[in-house]
Amino acid sequence: MNNDRRFGLKRHITLPGELALDGGSLLTGIEIAYETYGHLNADASNAILICHPLTADQFAASDHPITGKPGWWSRMIGKGKPIDPERYCIICSNVLGSCLGSTGPSSFTPGTETPYAMNFPVITIRDMVRAQAKLLDYLGIRQLKAVIGGSMGGMQALEWASTYPDRVKSVVIIASTARHSAQNIAFHEVGRQAIMADPKWRQGNYYEEKDPPVAGLAVARMAAHITYLSESGLTARFGRRLQSRQEKSFGFDADFQIESYLRHQGIRFVERFDANSYLYITRATDYFDLAEEHGGKLANAFRGTKSRFCVISFDSDWLYPTSESRVIVHALNAAGAAVSFMELSNPNGHDSFLLDAPDLHRTVHGFLEGDRA
C-alpha cells in the first residue's frame, strides 16, 4: 500500500452520494479530511480507527499545521508505543461539523462560495460515525481491528459498536459516557451563549468580515477547560499563587496563576478553531444518548455483539466520572459482551488520557495484544 495515494498525511476525500442525517437533512459533497499512519496489510485486517475528542482533529500523531505542536495523541501513537504504525494501519479523520478540513459550518455550500454558517444542519455523533464508515469504504476497509476513542471519541466508538457491530472487532472507550448529563449540557450551554453573546458572532455570519467572535469563543474554551481538569490537580499546579507579582493588584488583571492559565488556553484555542463548529459539535455531544436510540435500554445497543470491549476511566475525572463508565460496563454485561474495565488513578482529571498516563498506555497495549487474530 506504500504507493496508494489514499493513505498518508493530510488526505481528503469527497464522499460519494448523499448522507442522510438524524435530523432529517441530506448533505451532499461532504469533504472528509483524514490522516493514516502505517500500512494496511494484504487482507486489510490491521486497521485501527482513532476517534478524536471534541476540539481535536485528524492530526493525532503528526505536527499540527496551525500550531506546529506534536499530534494530540502522539504519546499513544508511534513506533514502540501502544498503537504502533509499524504494526497497524491507523486512521484518524476530522469529524463532520468540524473546521480542519471536513465539511462544517465554515465550508462552502455545494456549488457556491458562500459558507453554510448557521444553515449547516445540526448533526449527531451517529452522523459523524456514518461519515467515517463511508471513509472506510473508500479505503477498502471492511472491518476494523479496533476503534479507539477518548471523551467524545469514546462516544463515537460506542456508536460504531452499536451501528456497525460487524465492522468492529474490538472497542476501546476511554473517559467517556453513553449519554450527556444535565451538568455536561449546562457547561456546553454556557460556552455557546458566550459565543452567541459576542457582537462579532453576527448570527453566525462572520466569515466574510474575517473578524470572528474570538472573545466569546475564548470564554467558551475557558469554561470547558475547567471541566477537563481536577481540583487536586489545579491546587497542586496553581493553588492560590500569584502570577508575576508579589501582591494582589486590587484590579481585574490576571492576579492568580490559574486566571492567567485559563486566559492563555482561550487565546491559543481561537487560533485553531471555528466558533460555529464549536456550537455544532457541542450540540452533537449534548444530543448523544445511546440508550435513547435503542428504546431507552442501553444494553439493547449491544445486543448480539461479537466485539471485545475495554472501558477505561480515571478516578479524578468529574466530567465523565467512573460511574458513567460503570453504566456502560453493566450494559455490556447485560448484553453478554466480552468486556474488561479499568479505573486508573491519575491526578489530571478528564484530560488524563491526553497526558502522560503510563497505566493507560499499558492497558491499551495489553488489550490490543489480547486480540492477535
Curated annotation (Swiss-Prot):
Domain AB hydrolase-1 positions: 46-355
Residues at the catalytic site: 151 (nucleophile), 317, 350
GO biological process: homoserine metabolic process; methionine biosynthetic process
Pathway this chain belongs to: Amino-acid biosynthesis; L-methionine biosynthesis via de novo pathway; O-acetyl-L-homoserine from L-homoserine: step 1/1
Subcellular locations according to the entry: Cytoplasm
Gene Ontology molecular function: homoserine O-acetyltransferase activity
One GO CC annotation: cytoplasm
Keywords assigned by UniProt, alphabetized: Acyltransferase, Amino-acid biosynthesis, Cytoplasm, Methionine biosynthesis, Transferase
EC number of the protein: 2.3.1.31
Coiled coil regions, renumbered to chain: none
Keyword Acyltransferase among record annotations: yes
Catalytic activity: L-homoserine + acetyl-CoA = O-acetyl-L-homoserine + CoA
Similarity field: Belongs to the AB hydrolase superfamily. MetX family.
Description of how the protein assembles with itself and partners: Homodimer.
NCBIfam families: homoserO_Ac_trn, PRK00175.1
Protein's recorded name: Homoserine O-acetyltransferase
Organism this protein belongs to: Zymomonas mobilis subsp. mobilis (strain ATCC 31821 / ZM4 / CP4)
Organism classification: Bacteria, Pseudomonadati, Pseudomonadota, Alphaproteobacteria, Sphingomonadales
